[in-house]
Amino acid sequence: VAHPFHREVGEGDDRDVLGHAEAELAQRADGPEGDEVVGGEDRRGRLWTIGIRDPRRPGEVIALLPLEDTSVSTSGDYERYFIEDGVRYHHLIDPASGQSPSGVHSVTVIGEDGLSTEAFSKCVFVLGVEKGMQFIESQPELDAVVVDAHGLLHYSTGLLAPGLQTRQ
């Protein structure tokens, strides 16, 4: 997850580029998996804008989400992985197969609390796009953005609003 001040929160990595600017966040949670808690408004009175990292283009943002008083967690296959014989193996494991799921590159879940969003981002990743989004749609307190294996973005219906911006 990238923040408007170019702060990247990636899996297992937290770098502050403009340290003092981050003090504007009313709350902040620096979990190991790309977790954020945003509260209040920025210094201009606007909603915070959180950027979702492009899982295949380091340093680029694939979508921007305007958020207020919420928690955000992202799970992906792009930080903790290795490639062997052309197959990407990563730290998220499907318990049914014992393998790393390959249909999704990244899942960002938005909800009321960070513990839930962190757990659900991993669940949706393992479930895949179709079943994962069905699950999210059945939970009125959650929204999600999924980047599939083809780089396509899938949004829950709660995020299909005019303020959502994506890379073309």
For every predicted segment, state its role.
Residues 4-17, 21-25:
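Alpha-helix boundary/capping motif
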Residues 15, 19, 28-168:
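Mature catalytic core of soluble alpha/beta enzymes
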